Amino acid sequence: MAKKIQAYIKLQVKAGQANPSPPVGPALGQHGVNIMEFCKAFNAKTQGMEPGLPTPVIITVYSDRSFTFETKSTPASVLLKKAAGLTSGSARPNTVKVGTVTRAQLEEIAKTKQADLTAADLDAAVRTIAGSARSMGLNVEGV
């Protein structure tokens, strides 16, 4: 028989840098999950990723206090800011442009994100990422 699910916890944790301090500790502690066990497993799973990139994770907590987790790819906005060399997007994206990204950069980001996007092919994924870039106040070249 399958285990009974007690809760789903959604967090963004920096790749390879999970530790018991907030936000990880309190979120897992209130469900009785072994925090250090999660931190070790998460850090091991994200070892191949670039350290420090925020990584969304969905933790499924079961009634016997065991857990499983699934990591997603880094948010597109973070990857776009990194590609454009910015710290934040534009406060007024339609009037003030703060940077530029090329089609090659968009394709690289789309390849990274394609597993988490609903796009049918790479070109559709590039257009989705280009829309995110425009909504952040970035000029998009070649799309």
Curated annotation (Swiss-Prot):
One function term, GO molecular function aspect: structural constituent of ribosome
Post-translational modification: One or more lysine residues are methylated.
Gene Ontology CC annotations of this record: cytosolic large ribosomal subunit
GO annotation, biological process: translation
Highest taxon in the source lineage: Bacteria
Alphabetical UniProt keywords: Methylation, Ribonucleoprotein, Ribosomal protein, RNA-binding, rRNA-binding
Gene3D superfamilies: Ribosomal protein L11, C-terminal domain, Ribosomal protein L11/L12, N-terminal domain
Subunit structure of this chain's protein: Part of the ribosomal stalk of the 50S ribosomal subunit. Interacts with L10 and the large rRNA to form the base of the stalk. L10 forms an elongated spine to which L12 dimers bind in a sequential fashion forming a multimeric L10(L12)X complex.
Function (record text): Forms part of the ribosomal stalk which helps the ribosome interact with GTP-bound translation factors.
Family membership: Belongs to the universal ribosomal protein uL11 family.
Protein name as catalogued: Large ribosomal subunit protein uL11
Naturally occurring in which organism (per UniProt): Ectopseudomonas mendocina (strain ymp)
UniProt gene name: rplK
